[in-house]
Each structure stands twice: as structure tokens, then as C-alpha cells.
């Protein structure tokens, strides 16, 4: 009896083990089949699909796609500064993979970011299709989760109806009249910075002072936004947000340069734990801003009081969010507002200052205009800004040559025809903004030269130019909501600087633009400032 039971149990156990082993093998086989489909067979089908339509590119390599060659080209380009040292022909250095592969495969070609196909499109009419006429077929691509965590899950990273709703909520705040309440904070910040610079120039003996404007100009948005949003009493909270975001940006930049591995960000590695801590601290400081924002909203606008702490401007500017958004949504939106507000403005000021230092004739023209419009003593006001035409042309030309975002990406939501080519669903479409801005077909033979006159109101070339040939802040429905704010702040800041100082490049300056998250000078931007006498100003 015992032996019979043991035999039966042994047979049943063996059968169970065999079934489990078979199930495991089936699961392993299915997983391997899915991996092979995702990492090999589908990319090969997509590659053949585009090749049949005459679209080619560097061949797909298992798992890594074109990434290894792309990184090699980027590293090689970054190893050498610009030649000649004041050249604005920076496309081969900033987007070397585009410059290289376009010569081999044409303006429309296929590259691979990991297993994801990216169709590169640089012709303005095709860009119009992606961003305007066929925009319903495309969506903003899914950014790396760490980028989203850093920027915030706000307007720039939302999709569909959630994005449309948020855009409707935010748009009224960026009306021109609302933006102008920020101008005094920018002017006041720059004035304090210039007072310090003038003191340094006097103390130095030579009557001039050298600063790295790539770092120095970060104070403009940082202090203006912090003071306007948090006031004097909570200034340290605002400053902490920027300091913590700077550290988090390093981790986000590193993650952005690598192929994304799903789930890796949840592993308790040393870097991930630090990222989580930084995010918690940023949220904690921003929560105080949200509390003040909600208080401002509950005070019904005109009755709101800053409590004598000097804040209120930014709170009034952003108070429209409080009734329509939760505290968590405001925090996410504020993350992006603080980061984008700082990086976009500081980089625009940096490259404009570098360009004007390279081209003193335009620096002097802008200075004469500022003095004529604003006078010799008063700070720029909202009434002055529309009259600063030359300064506006200079800013546009700087944005053309040195756009903050050198490319943008959209994802095909479904199979869609683009320029006679059928683009499969899931394909990313990359628009190299800098390449379009530097294209001689759109801008003429002097496309690589600094010539603000091309943006003059009476310039015939501007009237003939394709509307998608200039898009420093993107295009279509998802164009940057803060572009007018950045231009307004830059005009105010530069007007204050030009009236008080003349400047030139330091002998230590090395012209080496590169892309991290946005376009920035690889080795900084040291500039020498000399105070102007009242007679010369």
C-alpha cells in the first residue's frame, strides 16, 4: 500500500515538474520571441520599408541602433573648437551626425535611437506638414522619464486632452500685459548685478572686469523669478529650487544621453536614491510657493498683498493657475517654469552678448537705439520695449544661429504619408531646427554669418522666406508658450547692460557651442566689461 502511494506521488510530482518546466520553457521562448521581434525583426522590416521608398541611413545595429556611431561623431566634434574662432557656422560641431549623414543620405534619412526609428526631416514644407497640416497624426514624443521628473509633468510633457486643457489654463497668463509685470524684477536684478560689476571694475585698477557670462547671466532669471515668486521672506526657498534643479539637471543630462532601459529608474541605486531625494526637496520648497499662490488667488487679485516682502509680481502673474489646478499640478508646472525660464533666458543673453562682442558695430547700433528710446537714466519700461527694433533684430538673429533647442521630435500616432513617403506608426520624426536655421536655400549665401538686418521689417527676403524656416521656440500648436516672456526679459536685460557697459570677448574665450540639454558654450563665455562714461553712454 505504502509503495503504491509513494509510486503514485512520485509519478504525480514528476509530471508536475515536467509541466512546470515545459511552461517555463514556453515562457522563455515567448519572451525571447518578443525580444527578437522588438530588437531585430521589426527594425529590419522598418528599414526595408523605408529603403523601398528611397529613404536610407546608417544601418540598424542590434539593440543600439545608430547610437554608437552617433556618439562617436558627437565626441569627435566636441574635441575641437570652432575654426575660425569667431565662426557662426556651428552646425557641423553641434549636430555632426546630421551634417555627416545628410551628405551621405540626403535631407530625409533614417537613423536609429536604440530600436526606435527616427526619420530626419529638414525641408520646411515637410516640417509644415508635421507641425501644422498633418499635426493630428503626430504627437510629442515620450521624453526620458528622468527628463520628465526633472522638467515636471506639466505642459511640455502632457498629451492629448490633458495637454489641451492645461494650455487653455496657462495661455492667458502669457498675454503681453501680464508679462510686463515681470519686467521690473528683471531690470532691478540686472541693475544690482551691474552695480557689483562696476565696483569690480573700479577695484581692479584697469577700469574693467571679466566675467563668465554663461554663469553670470543665470543670476538674471534666477534672482528675478525667486524674488518675484517668493519675496524676501522666502527667498531662500526659491534659491534652493534652482540649486537643487542644477544638480538634478546633471543626472537628467546623463540619462538623456543613454538608451532608456524600462524600470531602471526604480532600482535603489546610489544615483537613483539621490534623484529621489532631490525631487522631494524641490517639491517641498515649491509647496511653499503654491501656498502663497493660493493665498494670492483667494485674495481676489487687486486686494492681494505681498506682506511687504517685495514679492507678489510672479504670484500675481501665476495666480490664475490656483482655481483651475491642484496643488500637485501647480508644483509640476512650476518645475518646468523655473527651469525653462532660467535656461532659456540665460542662454539667450549669453549667446547675444557673445555675438555682440564679436560684432561691435551691431553692439554700438543697439546701444544708440537704447539711449535714444530709453534715455540715459531711466530703466526700460513696457512702453519702451516695442520701440527697440534693432535689439529685436539682434535677438532674432542670435536665436537663428544659436537656437536654445537644436532639434525637436514628434511621433507618428498612426501610419501617415509625409512627402510621398509612408511613415509607419511609432516612427519618430526628428526636425533639426539648427539645420533649417543655417540652410542657405532659406537664408541666402550668408546663412552662416551674423546679419540682424535680415530681420528688418523692410527686408524682401523675409517676406519670401518659408514660415517654417525660423522656429527657435518650436512650431505648431505646441510652440513654446513662454517665447514672448523670454524675448521681453532679454530686451530688458540687454537694454540695461548696453546703456552702462561696452564689452568684448576675453582672450581666454574659446568658441565651442555644444548641446547638453540646450545649446551652451562648452568652455564658458568669458567677456570683458568696461563701464561707459555718462558722456559716451
From Swiss-Prot:
Signal peptide feature range: none
Keyword presence, Membrane: yes
Compartment list: Membrane
Residues binding heme: 480
Top-level EC class: oxidoreductase
Induction: By brassinolide and dark treatment.
PROSITE patterns (alphabetical): CYTOCHROME_P450 (PS00086)
Source organism superkingdom: Eukaryota
Membrane topology of the entry: Single-pass membrane protein
InterPro entries, per database record: Cyt_P450 (IPR001128), Cyt_P450_CS (IPR017972), Cyt_P450_E_grp-I (IPR002401), Cyt_P450_sf (IPR036396), Cytochrome_P450_Monooxygen (IPR050665)
GO molecular function terms noted in the UniProt entry: heme binding; iron ion binding; monooxygenase activity; oxidoreductase activity, acting on paired donors, with incorporation or reduction of molecular oxygen
Residue intervals passing through the bilayer: 13-33
One Gene Ontology biological process: brassinosteroid homeostasis
Its EC number(s): 1.14.-.-
Organs and tissues of expression: Exclusively expressed in roots.
UniProt keyword list: Heme, Iron, Membrane, Metal-binding, Monooxygenase, Oxidoreductase, Transmembrane, Transmembrane helix
Cofactors demanded by this protein: heme
Cellular component terms (Gene Ontology): membrane
Protein purpose: Cytochrome P450 probably involved in brassinosteroids (BRs) inactivation and regulation of BRs homeostasis.
Family: Belongs to the cytochrome P450 family.
Name of protein: Cytochrome P450 734A5
Naturally occurring in which organism (per UniProt): Oryza sativa subsp. japonica
Amino acid at each position: 500500500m505504502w509503495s503504491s502511494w509513494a509510486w503514485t506521488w512520485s509519478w504525480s510530482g514528476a509530471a508536475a515538474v515536467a509541466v512546470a518546466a515545459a511552461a517555463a520553457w514556453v515562457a522563455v521562448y515567448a519572451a525571447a520571441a518578443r525580444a527578437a521581434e522588438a530588437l531585430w525583426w521589426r527594425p529590419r522590416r522598418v528599414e526595408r520599408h523605408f529603403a523601398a521608398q528611397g529613404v536610407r541611413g546608417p544601418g540598424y545595429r542590434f539593440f543600439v541602433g545608430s547610437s554608437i556611431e552617433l556618439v562617436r561623431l558627437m565626441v569627435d566634434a566636441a574635441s575641437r573648437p570652432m575654426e575660425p574662432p569667431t565662426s557662426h557656422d556651428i552646425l557641423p560641431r553641434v549636430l555632426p551626425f546630421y551634417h555627416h549623414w545628410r551628405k551621405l543620405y540626403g535631407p530625409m534619412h533614417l537613423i536609429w535611437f536604440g530600436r526606435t526609428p527616427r526619420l530626419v526631416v529638414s525641408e520646411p514644407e515637410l516640417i509644415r506638414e508635421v507641425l501644422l497640416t498633418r499635426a493630428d497624426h503626430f504627437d510629442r514624443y515620450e521624453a526620458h522619464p528622468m527628463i520628465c521628473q526633472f522638467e515636471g509633468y506639466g505642459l511640455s510633457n502632457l498629451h492629448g486632452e490633458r495637454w489641451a486643457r492645461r494650455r487653455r489654463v496657462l495661455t492667458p497668463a502669457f498675454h503681453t500685459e501680464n508679462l510686463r509685470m515681470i519686467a521690473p524684477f528683471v531690470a532691478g536684478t540686472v541693475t544690482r548685478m551691474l552695480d557689483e560689476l562696476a565696483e569690480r571694475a573700479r577695484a581692479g585698477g584697469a577700469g574693467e572686469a571679466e566675467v563668465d557670462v554663461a554663469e553670470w547671466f543665470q543670476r538674471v532669471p534666477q534672482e528675478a523669478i525667486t524674488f518675484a515668486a517668493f519675496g524676501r521672506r522666502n527667498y531662500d526657498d526659491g534659491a534652493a529650487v534652482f540649486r537643487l534643479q542644477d544638480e538634478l539637471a546633471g543626472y537628467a543630462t546623463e540619462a538623456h544621453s543613454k538608451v532608456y532601459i524600462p524600470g531602471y529608474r526604480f532600482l535603489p541605486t546610489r544615483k537613483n536614491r539621490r534623484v529621489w531625494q532631490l525631487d522631494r526637496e524641490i517639491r517641498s520648497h515649491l509647496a511653499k510657493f503654491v501656498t502663497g499662490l493660493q493665498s494670492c488667488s483667494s485674495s481676489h487679485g487687486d486686494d492681494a498683498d505681498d506682506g511687504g516682502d517685495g514679492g507678489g509680481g510672479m504670484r500675481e502673474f501665476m495666480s490664475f493657475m490656483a482655481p483651475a489646478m491642484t496643488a500637485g499640478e501647480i508644483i509640476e508646472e512650476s518645475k518646468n517654469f523655473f527651469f525653462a525660464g532660467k535656461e532659456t533666458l540665460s542662454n539667450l543673453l549669453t549667446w547675444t552678448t557673445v555675438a555682440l562682442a564679436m560684432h561691435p558695430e551691431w553692439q554700438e547700433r543697439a546701444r544708440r537705439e537704447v539711449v535714444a528710446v530709453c534715455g540715459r537714466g531711466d530703466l526700460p519700461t513696457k512702453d519702451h520695449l516695442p520701440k527697440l527694433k534693432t535689439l529685436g533684430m539682434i535677438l532674432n538673429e542670435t536665436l537663428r544661429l544659436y537656437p536654445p533647442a537644436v532639434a525637436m521630435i514628434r511621433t507618428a500616432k498612426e501610419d501617415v504619408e509625409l512627402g510621398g513617403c509612408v511613415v509607419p506608426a511609432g516612427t519618430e520624426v526628428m526636425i533639426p531646427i539648427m539645420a533649417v536655421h543655417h540652410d542657405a536655400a532659406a537664408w541666402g549665401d550668408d546663412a552662416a554669418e551674423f546679419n540682424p538686418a535680415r530681420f528688418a521689417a523692410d527686408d524682401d527676403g523675409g517676406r519670401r522666406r518659408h514660415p517654417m524656416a525660423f522656429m527657435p521656440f518650436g512650431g505648431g500648436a505646441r510652440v513654446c508658450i513662454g517665447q514672448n516672456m523670454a524675448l521681453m526679459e532679454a530686451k530688458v536685460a540687454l537694454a540695461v547692460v548696453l546703456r552702462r557697459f561696452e564689452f568684448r570677448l576675453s582672450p581666454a574665450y574659446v568658441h565651442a557651442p555644444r548641446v547638453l540639454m540646450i545649446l551652451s558654450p562648452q568652455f564658458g563665455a568669458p567677456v570683458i566689461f568696461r563701464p561707459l562714461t555718462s558722456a559716451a553712454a
